[in-house]
């Protein structure tokens, strides 16, 4: 099962996720990441692929979920800065 992605978790490009929209749901003391969260390089909106867990009406992001390009694209891998880490002990089945 995939790990739940959170605020501050890494992206493939070396950025971290900015997941501050839902400050009332935490995983390991970090705000949970939801569909559309951006990264620390600017842009890079995450596309949640979890099909059945919502926070504030948005799907939860999991480790490995894809992202749109960030502001440093076309430098690789900024054109697809996918989620690349998550909680060590909180998982969601697909």
Summary of predicted features, one role per range:
Residues 2-94:
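Intrinsically disordered, low-complexity proline/glycine-rich segments
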């Amino acid at each position: 099962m995939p790990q739940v992605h959170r605020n501050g978790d890494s992206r493939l490009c070396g950025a971290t996720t900015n997941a501050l929209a839902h400050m009332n749901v935490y995983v390991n003391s970090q705000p949970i990441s939801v569909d559309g969260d951006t990264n620390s390089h600017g842009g890079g909106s995450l596309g949640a692929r979890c099909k059945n867990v919502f926070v504030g009406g948005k799907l939860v992001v999991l480790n490995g979920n894809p992202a749109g390009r960030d502001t440093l694209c076309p430098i690789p891998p900024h054109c697809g800065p996918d989620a690349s880490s998550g909680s060590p002990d909180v998982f969601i089945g697909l």
